[in-house]
């Protein structure tokens, strides 16, 4: 089963051989970010179903490892401490750790490596593994008009994901063809199943949390005076892109509404989000601010504890979707068809502007004063949350009646 690296996709005979092949040592590469890690969970589940006896490891950053570590389909996590390279005084130690990581990957003798990250660094990990089969996405294709029954989008950004980047496709023995860009990231990742012979079962995004994580979340809430029986709304106002931030007043308005309704309201985020969360908490007295106090796994535990989560387009949105929780996400510069909550278009709130989505990351790039986010009001979000909670309550009552 030797494929030619230079071929853009596998030949028919080789594809059939690959689908019928068995592998005993598998490495899945998707270090970050949180949302992308969640998107990769269905690939892990289908790998386990396809190769039930194989050892399946995941190369991932330490901060995201706890989100996947307890997954029953996973054998082991391989930690890539990427952030150490940017810490002063830690770079020499980071380089030593990096070489140790390369040796660890090489010694594992993987026979199948799947690179879902598609950058030069992740491709290097795939290449250094020495695996006889290395799979990743093909080179970028041309972007075309987005057509979707779920969202009517009037703008097609000229940039964004179009395939493997930075020449990473050169490292792969088999490349995943890219027939279209008009597809959600989860479905795109599952295209690897065409090469490996995955089953046709619906994608399983379930996050498996440890009992320790659940206890830690309850401790954090108790310290803030939230009773275990009190209904909880979680607001996650952070995101990496400047343009994906909904307004401070928008989140504060949502918080004030649900505080009046008798809910506990918790803010969650990383240390980077602390200034934003402090402003929201100040504008909505009674809100408990947990920003900077939770890991990604704690965030998942907090959202699982909640009645509903309200987010930007961020990893927290995908965590909420994976947990099956009622949630609402505010979208502006990005495309909900590609990276929205999976198969939950009703959870997206956005205004219909001809410039959206644009995929601009910085506010300085926007010539319209961030209109796509500023025009989304707290009343719009509250109305959508109430509708989703009402629908969830009706479904739960119906299921309860059926089970009796």
Predicted regions and their residues:
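Catalytic machinery of carbohydrate-active enzymes
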Residues: 1-404
């Amino acid at each position: 089963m030797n494929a030619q690296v230079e071929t853009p996709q596998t030949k028919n005979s080789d594809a059939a051989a690959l689908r019928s092949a068995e592998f005993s040592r598998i490495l899945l590469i998707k270090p970050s970010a949180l949302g992308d890690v969640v998107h990769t969970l269905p690939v892990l589940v289908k790998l386990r179903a396809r190769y039930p006896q194989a050892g399946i490891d995941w190369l991932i950053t330490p901060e995201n490892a706890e989100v996947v570590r307890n997954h029953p389909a996973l054998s082991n996590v391989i930690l890539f401490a990427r952030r150490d390279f940017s810490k002063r005084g830690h770079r020499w130690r980071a380089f030593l750790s990096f070489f140790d990581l390369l040796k660890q990957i090489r010694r594992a003798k993987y026979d199948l490596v799947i690179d879902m990250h598609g950058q030069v660094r992740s491709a290097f990990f795939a290449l250094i593994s020495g695996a006889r089969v290395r799979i990743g996405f093909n080179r970028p294709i041309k972007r075309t008009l987005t057509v979707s029954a779920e969202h009517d989008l009037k703008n097609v950004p000229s940039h964004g994901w179009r395939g493997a980047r930075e020449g990473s496709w050169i490292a792969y023995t088999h490349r995943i063809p890219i027939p279209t860009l008009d597809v959600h990231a989860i479905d795109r990742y599952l295209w690897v199943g065409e090469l490996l012979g995955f089953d046709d079962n619906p994608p399983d995004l379930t996050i498996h949390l440890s009992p320790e994580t659940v206890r830690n979340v309850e401790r954090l809430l108790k310290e803030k005076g939230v009773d275990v029986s009190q209904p909880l709304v979680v607001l996650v106002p952070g995101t990496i892109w400047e343009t994906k931030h909904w307004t401070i007043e928008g989140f504060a308005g949502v918080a004030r509404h649900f505080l009046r309704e008798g809910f506990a309201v918790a803010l969650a985020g990383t240390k980077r989000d602390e200034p934003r969360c402090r402003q929201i908490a100040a504008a909505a007295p009674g809100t408990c601010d947990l920003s900077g106090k939770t890991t990604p796994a704690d965030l998942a535990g907090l959202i699982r504890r909640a009645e509903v989560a309200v987010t930007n387009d961020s990893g927290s949105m995908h965590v909420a979707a994976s947990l099956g929780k009622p949630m609402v996400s505010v979208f502006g510069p990005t495309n909900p068809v590609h990276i929205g909550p999976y198969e939950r278009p009703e959870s997206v709130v956005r205004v219909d502007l001809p410039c959206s989505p644009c995929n601009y990351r910085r506010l300085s790039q926007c010539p319209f004063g961030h209109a796509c986010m500023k025009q989304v009001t707290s009343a719009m979000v509250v109305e959508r949350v109430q509708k989703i909670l009402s629908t969830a309550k009706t479904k739960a009552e119906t299921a309860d009646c059926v089970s009796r």
